[in-house]
Every structure is written in structure tokens, then in C-alpha cells.
A protein has these predicted regions:
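N-terminal export signals
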Residues: 1-13
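Extracytoplasmic/lumenal soluble domains of exported proteins with redox or metal-associated functions
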Residues: 11-96
Length: 96
């Protein structure tokens, strides 16, 4: 699960030093190619409706699990990600 790479979201993406920004851009752009209507504002509202506080990660994990149960899958170069994970990569790519 892509969320395992991000232990918390209390700060913006640039403070995640271990993030492979090139990979984030590639995955985020691939997701955005199939969701051209997505904007930084809409993705932020979708992924972080209560802000990026301590409750954000459990909420994202629940959304990821719900995506997999519902078959909302995003496939990029053989990787099977939830739609929520794809959206998160897109948002991180926009913020970096």
C-alpha cells in the first residue's frame, strides 16, 4: 500500500525527504491522465476533508480499503493501487 511510505500528513509534501519525487510525478500524472478534471483543490478536499491532522492517515487507510473492496483500482506499470492512492500521488505531484 502506498500509504505505508507516508507515516503522517501533518505537513506538506516537501517535508517528506524520502519521497521519490520523480516516481510521485509519474504515478500522479498517470492517474491525472484518466481524471483530467481533478485539481489540487478538489483532491485536497476529497483526501483531507478534516485537514492533515492525526486523523488523516486512518481515514485514508479506510478509503483505500473501501476502494479495493469496491474494485476501484488504478493500475500503473503493473502496480495495483487504489483510486485513493492514485489521487494521493496526483495531489503530492501537484504540491512538489
Amino acid at each position: 500500500m502506498a500509504l505505508a511510505a507516508a507515516p503522517g500528513f501533518s505537513a506538506a509534501a516537501p517535508s517528506l525527504p524520502d519521497l521519490d519525487r520523480n516516481a510521485v510525478r509519474r504515478i500522479g500524472q498517470a492517474w491525472r491522465d484518466s481524471h483530467p478534471e481533478a485539481t489540487e483543490r478538489t483532491l485536497s478536499a476529497r483526501l483531507f476533508p478534516a485537514g492533515r491532522g492525526p486523523e488523516a492517515l486512518p481515514a485514508l487507510r479506510a478509503a483505500v480499503a473501501a476502494d479495493f473492496r469496491a474494485g476501484r483500482i488504478f493500475i500503473h506499470r503493473g502496480w495495483r493501487l487504489s483510486d485513493t492512492e492514485g489521487a494521493l500521488f496526483a495531489l503530492l505531484a501537484m504540491e512538489t
